[in-house]
């Protein structure tokens, strides 16, 4: 029996609900015995055994921080995607970027701050001096997804507006260098890279509106010469190995004007709505949504 866990309590709940429903209907169409459980209110670990399989469709901390995976591993219940250690490596952007840097995988320069509002209060006018070498930055929560509370920062006024707009400015954030870029993502399925997808949007970057609101965002197959394609895939597979990921994941990157690649982050539970990046990439090589779901639950 397969259980799809969806929902959760994070800011990505609505996305998770859509992903979970699409996965559930796909599994039903494939002939599996399947149930949907809204996590955590209807989830009790005691109801599962080693004969069960959990498809984790939870985005944000509920499904990607590693806590749920740890519980399932202790109970020896099989589940989709990476184990708890890999999730812990990828969930915190500072931890992830430190691992990338340690293993010589290119990633934009960054500064980690434990509390955004406290940092602003302590630094006052000195703040921009600290970040001056970066020219322009992205402000991102150290732990969150779907581009929630992500802002482009060019000056102190931008920072003040970002702090005012944040859902929670007392948590940890990173300031990340803005690379002159193309934005792209590479899904990985069972140890092989699916076609890279380039993201084009009229927004200043691929923010929440670009992902879920605006209709003009384009997801295009990212065409590269063979040598650059091989380089990109090597970077992504090395990233997967360094983080300890397995099964399915998505590596988000930038390409600068000199055609260099930079890894931004790793998603251990990628979006699985019918219009998400992962299914779009799979579709471009003839892998239907149902085929993709079937392969995810059969990856090792």
Describe the residue ranges of each PLM region.
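Glycine-rich phosphate/pyrophosphate-binding beta-alpha loops
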Residues: 147, 202, 267-281
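Conserved metal-phosphate-binding beta-hairpin within the catalytic cores
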Residues: 177, 186-188, 241-272, 282
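ATP-binding N-terminal substructure of ATP-dependent carboxylate-amine bond-forming enzymes
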Residues: 1-91, 95, 114-126
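Cysteine/selenocysteine-centered motifs that mediate thiol-based redox chemistry or coordinate metal-sulfur cofactors
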Residues: 292-300
């Amino acid at each position: 029996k397969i259980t799809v866990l969806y929902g959760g309590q994070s800011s990505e709940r609505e996305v998770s609900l859509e992903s979970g429903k699409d996965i559930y209907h796909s599994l039903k169409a494939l002939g599996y015995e399947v149930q949907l459980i809204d996590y955590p209110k209807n989830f009790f670990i005691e109801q599962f055994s080693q004969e069960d399989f959990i498809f984790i469709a939870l985005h944000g901390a509920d499904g990607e921080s590693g806590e749920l995976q740890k519980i399932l591993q202790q109970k020896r219940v099989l589940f989709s995607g990476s184990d708890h250690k890999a999730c812990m490596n990828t969930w915190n952007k500072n931890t992830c970027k430190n691992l990338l840097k340690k293993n010589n995988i290119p990633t934009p320069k960054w500064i980690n701050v434990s509390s955004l509002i406290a940092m602003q209060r302590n630094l006052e006018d000195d703040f921009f001096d600290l970040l001056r070498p970066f020219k322009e930055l992205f402000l991102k929560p150290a732990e969150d997804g779907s581009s929630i509370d992500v802002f482009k920062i060019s000056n102190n006024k931008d920072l003040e507006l970002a702090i005012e707009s944040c859902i929670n400015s007392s948590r940890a954030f990173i300031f990340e260098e803005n690379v002159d870029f193309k934005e792209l993502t590479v899904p990985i399925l069972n140890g092989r890279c699916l076609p890279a997808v380039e993201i084009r949007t009229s927004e200043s970057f691929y923010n929440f509106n670009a992902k879920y609101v605006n209709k003009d965002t384009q997801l295009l197959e990212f065409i590269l010469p063979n040598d650059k394609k091989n380089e990109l895939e090597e970077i992504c597979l090395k990233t997967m190995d360094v983080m300890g990921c397995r099964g399915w994941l998505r590596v988000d990157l930038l390409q600068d004007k000199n055609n260099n690649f930079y890894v931004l982050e790793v998603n251990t539970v990628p979006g699985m709505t019918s219009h998400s990046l992962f299914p779009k990439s799979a579709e471009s090589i003839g892998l239907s949504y149902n085929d993709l779901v079937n392969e995810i639950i059969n990856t090792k």
